[in-house]
């Protein structure tokens, strides 16, 4: 029905593009007028636009003229003129939508249109890329255009100082990676002084490779962590225990099947991606750890460590999920195949894998701050994105980010030939067919790019090609350092490249070879340093004679190699262009489309074909049993391909099932994080008020009133007579911490006259008196500074503890689904109570610390920043303006507000 509707009326994207075309006509009509302007007149358009904005015109009013200005400036500065379809893409991005543009259609240039227009407001535009290389390249390259038009450009990459970051964010346009933007937001909400904040308000972001960032990475939260203080011994013991167990692996475990009857100690369910102990395994665990009952809440820690060891051994595969390099376990990105340095699995899984691999088990980290990309990017006032493949995920973009997807027509028609899938009975037959296809292409000089899903498979194919004497390049997580260079040359005559499905994303494969990378390689051979080569091929202005000489050499080499690659290009085109071979269908159709999209860029010829076996994970876990049975009944040879419409439909249906499951997982992550996000917003808003200089005296007095109320409600029974109240509790809770000793010692006559309201007033008056005495002792200015620092430190410490508690709660409530309770509703209810309790604890700690503080003016500290590195060490900063007055127990919280125990903080030398 939908297809019939689209035939008559066109698709949603067709209708949207048609609606935008009148705007494009207006832009194109302005071209002669813009071409007639001098450089100075063209530059003067920027202040003119800003003035018109201030006088009431809108960005939409300015759009046609502003886009025409950018188009002409780009022609003069970069030598590139925006095509009509690129103007359409620019309008879509300005409207806060996702523009799906095929590989090679010039997304980088398209972004300049909405970036310039929105930067005119002076509130900052963020251009988000997937890695530092692309952020640097695009900021330098497109920066020439923006600078020509009078706009400033900043760059956020790893390793910058706070001052450098602040300067970059204050620019009109800021390029950077999703990780850097997210981490800076978290760090800004951990500072003690407002001037240490680096970001401005989140105004407008354009996200490049938007599907990768907002969907593929949506399940992974950004976490700033410090080193925890828990021992790692239990991970080693749990690993030793799991090694003794007998395992049984199921493709899919029938719910009705009694796991108790299985002759194994633990079972792995591949489809559900779980590893669990059987009754036999539980019994062995209790014997090994010397405990009565593994399910007892007291044994939760042991149970957790065993579960992570089971996951490490049963589910996590070396050279697929992670690699071991330089005695470290490094995660492999499941989508790009890249090594993710600095990233660690959470909840102790990383430590369990370290124990499994026999490398040093690092201490578990403590989360200081975290946020998901979903919630970070939803904070922007306007958000848009670009990618080559978004349409298959349109439902998710709409429901979670309120973004619709518009497919932008290509400048030249796509002439790539996408062959139907070749399906084989087993993996051996499939790989033999792949090798035969490569040999056939290689004979005529047609370049081949083979996409694999794991290191193991790429190395297997490599060994098969070696046996047939076919020279080739392998690109996987182990050899990713030269990723861009290897991918760039994948279009050379006769080239054969094996790569993970999404490797080298952002690098164009040019038929005949890439002269830029060839020139760089030659410069390395001639002894040029890497930093000089980067400067020589970059776009920054310079007067450095060494770099100017290097640029001259580079230009000469580039021109020489360009002649060679242009001649070779003709031969590659004659051979059929780049041939893409997929060796397995990915869980997501989008990733398959990305692999296909590497060929046929800008009207180039090309071919693609996927080779599939019934032993592939997707078919094994999600293909229908009826289909598998039918294929078995045919009794085909392993080298005989199966081609049938039913089979193609089954593959697509399997992918749709997995996509739906993964969408449900991401949606579940968001449901839980939305609860946390509301609490995060409250805490961060409170912090910002403090940082912005709000007078805290009223807040502190209000806290004292709340504490007095809490004490009376907690210890005074319903009976109005004081004899029935818990005086021991009242005194131990209140005296020393909030009021001087003896304050609550009443005579018999006073007791007779006492009621709850009078007791509350006595406690409050005593706290207020002590507070006023402190202010006289310190002076108002120092008192306000003390209040500010103490409040921020206590809030940060309690928030960190709350994050841990919420994490534990989230894991715990999931089990309640078995009791027919909605885990999300349970989580919301209990997390609210925990948040209220955290706020009470913040108030009581802040008041207690302030009332018991003595300032030693000779030990006033220098100001320190809170969270410089990604893995921030928390608790060392601004902790010594305060030292104890009363004797503090060594295991009590330090009164300085650091959140550490006294013996590990100010009492460390005692």
Curated annotation (Swiss-Prot):
Where does it reside?
Answer: Cell membrane; Cytoplasm
Record's keyword terms, sorted:
ATP-binding, Cell membrane, Cytoplasm, Membrane, Metal-binding, Nucleotide-binding, Protein transport, Translocase, Translocation, Transport, Zinc
Q: Which organism is it from?
A: Acetivibrio thermocellus (strain ATCC 27405 / DSM 1237 / JCM 9322 / NBRC 103400 / NCIMB 10682 / NRRL B-4536 / VPI 7372) (Clostridium thermocellum)
The family classification in the record reads:
Belongs to the SecA family.
What is the protein's name according to its record?
Answer: Protein translocase subunit SecA
Q: Name one Pfam family in it.
A: SEC-C
Q: NCBIfam families, alphabetically?
A: PRK12904.1 (NF009538), secA (TIGR00963)
Q: HAMAP family per the record? A: SecA (MF_01382)
């Amino acid at each position: 029905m939908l297809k019939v509707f689209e035939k008559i009326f066109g698709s949603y994207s067709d209708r949207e593009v048609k609606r935008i075309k009148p705007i494009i006509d207006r832009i194109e009509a302005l071209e002669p007028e813009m071409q007639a302007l001098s450089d100075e007149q063209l530059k003067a358009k920027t202040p003119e636009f800003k003035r018109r904005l201030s006088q009431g015109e809108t960005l939409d009013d300015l759009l046609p003229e502003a886009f025409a200005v950018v188009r002409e400036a780009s022609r003069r500065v970069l030598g590139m003129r925006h095509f009509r379809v690129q103007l359409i893409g620019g309008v879509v991005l300005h409207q806060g939508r996702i523009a799906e543009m095929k590989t090679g259609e010039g997304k980088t240039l398209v972004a300049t249109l909405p970036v310039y227009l929105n930067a005119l407001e002076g509130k900052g535009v963020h251009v988000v890329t997937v890695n530092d290389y692309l952020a640097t390249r695009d900021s330098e390259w497109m920066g020439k255009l923006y600078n020509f038009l009078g706009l400033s450009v900043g760059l956020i990459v790893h390793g910058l100082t706070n001052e450098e970051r602040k300067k970059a964010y204050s620019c009109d346009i800021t390029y950077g990676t999703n990780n850097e933007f997210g981490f800076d937001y978290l760090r800004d909400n951990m500072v003690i002084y407002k001037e240490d904040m680096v970001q401005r308000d989140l105004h407008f972001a354009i996200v490049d490779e938007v599907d990768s960032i907002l969907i593929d990475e949506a399940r992974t939260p950004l976490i700033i962590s410090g080193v925890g203080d828990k021992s790692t011994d239990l991970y080693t013991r749990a690993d030793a225990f799991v090694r003794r167990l007998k395992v049984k692996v199921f493709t899919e475990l029938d719910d009705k099947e009694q796991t108790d009857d299985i002759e194994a100690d633990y079972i792995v369910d591949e489809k559900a991606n779980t590893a669990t102990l059987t009754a036999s395994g539980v019994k062995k665990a209790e014997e090994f750890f010397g405990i009565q009952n593994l399910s007892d809440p007291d044994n939760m820690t042991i149970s957790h460590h065993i579960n992570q060891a089971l996951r490490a051994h049963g589910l996590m595969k070396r050279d697929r999920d992670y690699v071991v390099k330089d005695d470290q376990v490094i995660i492999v990105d499941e989508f790009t195949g890249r090594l993710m340095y600095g990233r660690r699995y959470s909840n102790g899984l990383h430590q369990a894998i370290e124990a499994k691999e026999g490398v040093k088990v690092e201490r578990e980290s403590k989360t200081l701050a975290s946020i998901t990309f979903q919630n970070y990017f939803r904070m922007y006032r306007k958000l848009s994105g670009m990618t080559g493949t978004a349409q298959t995920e349109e439902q998710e973009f709409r429901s979670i980010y309120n973004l619709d997807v518009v497919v932008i027509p290509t400048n030249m028609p796509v002439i790539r030939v996408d062959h139907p899938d070749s399906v084989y009975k087993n993996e051996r037959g499939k790989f033999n067919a792949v090798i035969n296809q490569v040999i056939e292409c290689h004979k005529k000089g047609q370049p081949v790019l083979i996409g694999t899903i794991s290191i193991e498979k790429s190395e297997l194919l490599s060994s098969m090609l070696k046996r047939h004497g076919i020279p080739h390049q392998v690109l996987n997580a182990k050899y990713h350092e030269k990723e861009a260079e290897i991918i760039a040359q994948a279009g050379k005559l006769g080239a054969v490249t094996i790569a993970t499905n999404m490797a080298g994303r952002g690098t164009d494969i040019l038929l005949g070879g890439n002269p830029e990378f060839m020139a760089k390689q030659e410069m390395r051979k001639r002894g040029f340093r890497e930093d000089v080569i980067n400067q020589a091929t970059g776009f920054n202005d310079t007067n450095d004679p060494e770099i100017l000489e290097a640029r001259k050499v580079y230009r000469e080499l580039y021109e020489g190699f360009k002649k060679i690659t242009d001649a070779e290009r003709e031969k590659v085109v004659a051979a059929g262009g780049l041939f893409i071979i997929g060796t397995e269908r990915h869980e997501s159709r989008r990733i398959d489309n990305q692999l296909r999209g590497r060929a046929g860029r800008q009207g180039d010829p090309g071919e693609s074909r996927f080779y599939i076996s019934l032993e592939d994970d997707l078919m094994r876990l999600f293909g229908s049993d009826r289909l598998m049975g039918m294929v078995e009944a045919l009794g085909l040879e392993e080298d005989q391909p199966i081609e049938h419409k039913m089979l193609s439909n089954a593959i697509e249906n399997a992918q749709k099932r997995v996509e739906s499951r993964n969408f449900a997982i991401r949606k579940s992550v968001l449901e839980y994080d939305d609860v946390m996000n509301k609490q995060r917003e409250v805490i961060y808003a409170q912090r910002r008020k403090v940082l912005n200089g709000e007078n805290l005296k009223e807040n502190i007095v209000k806290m004292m009133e709340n504490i007095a109320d809490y004490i009376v409600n907690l210890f005074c029974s319903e009976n109005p007579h004081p004899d029935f109240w818990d005086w021991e509790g009242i005194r131990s809770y209140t005296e020393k911490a909030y009021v001087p000793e003896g304050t609550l010692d009443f005579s018999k006559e006073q007791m007779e006259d006492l009621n709850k309201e009078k007791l509350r007033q006595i406690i409050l008056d005593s706290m207020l008196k002590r507070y006023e005495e402190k202010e006289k002792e310190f002076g108002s200015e120092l008192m306000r500074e003390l209040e500010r620092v103490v409040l921020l430190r206590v809030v940060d410490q309690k928030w960190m503890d709350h994050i841990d508690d919420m994490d534990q709660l989230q894991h715990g409530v999931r089990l309640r689904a078995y009791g027919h309770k909605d885990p999300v509703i349970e989580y919301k209810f209990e997390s609210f109570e925990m948040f209220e309790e955290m706020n009470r604890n913040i108030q009581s700690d802040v008041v207690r610390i302030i009332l018991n503080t003595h300032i030693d003016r000779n030990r006033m500290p220098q100001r320190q920043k809170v969270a410089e590195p990604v893995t921030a060490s928390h608790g060392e900063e601004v902790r010594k303006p305060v030292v104890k007055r009363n004797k503090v127990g060594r295991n009590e919280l330090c009164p300085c507000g650091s959140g550490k125990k006294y013996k590990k903080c100010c009492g460390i030398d005692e």
